[in-house]
Each structure stands twice: as structure tokens, then as C-alpha cells.
Amino acid sequence: RMARILIIRFSALGDVAMTIPVIHSLAVQYPQHEITVLSRAVWQPLFQGLPANVGFVGADLTGKHKGLWGLNSLYSELKAMHFDYIADFHHVLRSKYLCLRFRLANKPVASICKGRAGKKKLVRRHDKVMENQKSSFRRYADVLEKLGLPVLLNFSSIYGEGKGNFAEIEPVTGPKEDQKWIGIAPFAKHAGKIYPLELQEQVIAHFAANPKVKVFLFGGGKSEQDVFDAWIAKYPSVVSMIGKLNIRTELNLMSHLDVMLSMDSANMHLASLVNIPVVSIWGATHPYAGFMGWKQLPVNTVQLDLSCRPCSVYGQKPCWRGDYACLRDIKPEQVIAKIEGLVD
């Protein structure tokens, strides 16, 4: 029997990207069901490559769906779609309210268990418990299992076994030929996750000097653009992608990279959706918290063993030592070696 499944995850970009391997697996394993994703409208392009039984509803949380009135009108829109199951992958005030309304209407609802206690033990300053926590992918899949929809996570790429259509990006990137393409996404939301820019510049300088390699910089916003402009002036072979691509074409380009260097950031998760290796740098945060990119190998992480790490699940806490040694003490040579191990 065909069932209609609603999956809720509003933000942030990295977490929304992490729903894709789970939703893709669900769609393929339950082709008879209709799946609808409720998220912020801006993330819709992420879901375009999914199987035909996946639809999307964009929430306008700063406009018509703002506040209690807005949520009630959003609920009315959803109610009219006659869902049989509601899977809350977010479990924040907004999604809890929608789920309450669905529960009152007698619909089966399941919500994510965030595993806060285990994460807390991981980041506390004293008596840390260094245990690998369940990944977000597993937590999302657990929500579906509670609804009687167990899923085997066997996703490889939004492009299946291939890559994005190169003709779509070639006008921006030029031909690839036998060059090695390296993507670098040097930023993250918080200082505790950003490898110091002067050290990242040494990594860029190293690869920019090699004519067989092309470096693409990924980022967004004015301050990041200023940093990129300064780097490009020094290293003319390096290309900034700011303002040149949308989410869809950015994923396409990522699929043609040989390796991506990123922080613990959304770009790590986007690159992981197109089946390329990611070298990820970890400071205040740690892969043990469960936010490692899909199918990324621990051997491709760069991180230091410090007794204070990790100090934060999301990286927003300022460094209590004051020196961000967890990032500052990573040598550019370590990062270069990891990247070269993957492109050679």
C-alpha cells in the first residue's frame, strides 16, 4: 500500500545535506511510497537529483510561515497533503509544534534522538569519555525505523555511479584534461573550526606552484571574497568560485574534483554527496561527535591529540586556552601530505 511520508529538517546546510544519503536510500528501498521533505526553500536544489518519489515543500520561516500564526498556516498546508507518517529529523521548537499538531490528528510521529548526554561527555573539560557517537546518518535512519520503515544506508552519490554534466560547468572552469583538480573550502561558521588562514595560504601556495594542479576556492560572502581576492592576486592560477555557481552547479563541479580540502563545515558534507575524498581539518570539534562526511575515511582527517579536544560539539565555544593550539599547531606540511596522498 502506498504511504505518504513527511520528513522535516529546516537547517543548517550541513545537517540538511546529511539527510540526503538517508532519504535517497529510503526512496529507492520503498519505491511504492511518496516522500516529501519539508525544509527551508533555499535548500531545494539539494533534493533535485533524488528519485522521482521524493518531493519538496519549502518553508518560508522568515515570511509567511513565521511565528505561531505562520506555523499554523504551514500545518494547514501540510494537513491537506494527507501524510501517513511524520519523521522529525530536527526536533527543534518549530518541528516539535508541527509534530504536536500531527499527533493530535492521530498521525504516527517519530523524532530524532540527538544523543546529547554522550556528546556532553565527549566535550567536557575533565574526565572526557572519548567514545565514537552515533552518526547523524544513523540517527536519521533510526527515526524512520521507529515508524516501521527500516532503511539500509547504501547511497553513493547524487549522480549515481557517475559525475555531474561537465558541459554545465565547463564555461566557468575550463577543460580539465589531465590536470588534478583540488577544491579548498577554507572557512566554517566558527573560529574553533577554521585552520588559520596564513597556514592555509601555505597549502594554497604549494599547489598553486604546480602547473599540473588547479585549485578552486569555495566560500561565500564579502569577507571571504576579500580573502580570496588577496590570494588570487598572489597566486594567479588559483580560481575563486564565489558568485559563479549555484548549489546545483557547485555540486557538479565538486563531483569533478580529485580531492576537497575542508574544515568541519557544510562543504565537507556537500563534497561527500558526490563521492569524492575529502581531507577535513578538525579543531574544537571532533569526528566522534557524529558529523563526519558521508563515507569519508578517518585516515583523511587532520587533527591533533590534545587533552582539551574536543571542547565543543558545534565549534561555537571560544578556546579556553586562548590560543587555538588544536588548529594553530597543525603544520601545513601535514595537510599537503594528505592531499598529495590522494591525488598522486
What are these model-predicted stretches?
Residues 1-344:
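Catalytic machinery of carbohydrate-active enzymes
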